[in-house]
Design a protein with these regions (language model features):
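Short, glycine-/aromatic-enriched active-site segment of Class I SAM-dependent methyltransferases
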Residues: 141-162
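A C-terminal cap/extension of S-adenosyl-L-methionine-dependent methyltransferases
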Residues: 90-92, 140, 184-245
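Short alpha-helix
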Residues: 162-176
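Conserved N-terminal segment of class I S-adenosyl-L-methionine
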Residues: 1-103, 109-113, 123-126, 186, ...
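A short hydrophobic/small-residue beta-strand
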Residues: 72, 139-140
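A short His-aromatic
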Residues: 114-118
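Short N-terminal helix/helix-N-cap motif within the alpha/beta-hydrolase-1
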Residues: 119-124, 151
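A short glycine-rich, Lys/Arg-flanked "PGG" loop and its adjoining helix->strand segment in the class I
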Residues: 123-135
Length: 245
């Protein structure tokens, strides 16, 4: 049996992975990518520039950042992602073991959401992000919070293999050479971003024993299902910077 992660077969390379797991029926695009992109522009990036989406998938966030004025490129392990290359610069790469197919110091910003947990080791991704980021550039890494998902939701996607906590995600980035690292919990409920005083209520609500899709076959309306799900399935959001020259 292969001992190295790069030697192991992975379903992530199969076009059917995106078609099934992130089908527009199961995961409609909606307004969330645009709302998150704007939030990150205002709170993390602070300006526009060249942005690389590592693990760009269907291209939802490429569209969102492009509409805000960013010059976007994407990279993903799935050949289905590269099928949208007629719109954006999109390349395929095994993020587990291959170097990112971009030049050193090429991008002002890095964005990577729900990717690093799919990798057996994070260092190829984060060291690659460091290499292609310009000095002073900012990277945003998002991944499920193990503290909030260990009881089951982490494995809703069967390809999740490496969980993270606030300190472990920060350590990974520091080892790669990043500085000014902030790692924190992040609720995927846009109205909470604007009204942080509501967080205690959300935390109390999350403790209620309510089922939700897709973890269980609950029959709530979509809006209430999202409230239940994203009060419980909290993300980690790390913002860091490559040192200036």
């Amino acid at each position: 049996m292969p001992n190295n992660p790069q030697d192991k077969p992975t379903v992530l390379k199969d076009p059917r992975y995106l078609e099934v797991t992130y089908s527009t029926t199961r995961a409609p695009v909606g307004e969330y990518p645009a709302m998150l992109a704007r939030h990150l522009m205002e709170t993390a990036y602070k300006k526009t520039g060249k942005l690389l989406d590592i693990g760009s998938g269907r291209g939802d966030f490429l569209d969102a950042f492009s509409h805000l004025g960013y010059e976007v490129s994407g990279v993903d392990i799935s050949p289905l992602s590269a099928a949208a290359a007629d719109t954006y610069t999109l390349k395929t790469c095994n993020l587990e073991c291959e170097p990112l197919p971009f030049n050193e110091n090429e991008f002002d910003f890095i964005f990577s959401k729900s990717v690093i947990e799919h990798l057996h080791t994070p260092y190829n991704l984060v060291s690659g992000a460091y290499r292609v980021l310009k000095p002073g550039g900012v990277a945003v890494i998002m991944t499920p919070s193990w503290a909030h998902t260990y009881w089951g939701p982490f494995y809703i996607d069967h390809t999740h293999v490496t969980p993270y906590t606030i300190p472990s995600l920060a350590d990974v980035l520091q080892i790669a050479g990043f500085e000014n690292i902030s790692s924190r919990y992040f609720y995927q409920l846009p109205w909470v971003w604007r009204h942080s005083s509501l967080l205690p209520i959300i935390r109390l609500f999350s403790a209620l024993p309510l089922s939700y899709r897709p973890y269980e076959n609950a029959r709530w309306p979509d809006s209430f299902n999202k409230l239940i799900r994203f009060s419980k399935e909290v993300m980690l959001l790390a913002v860091c910077q490559k040192p200036s020259r």
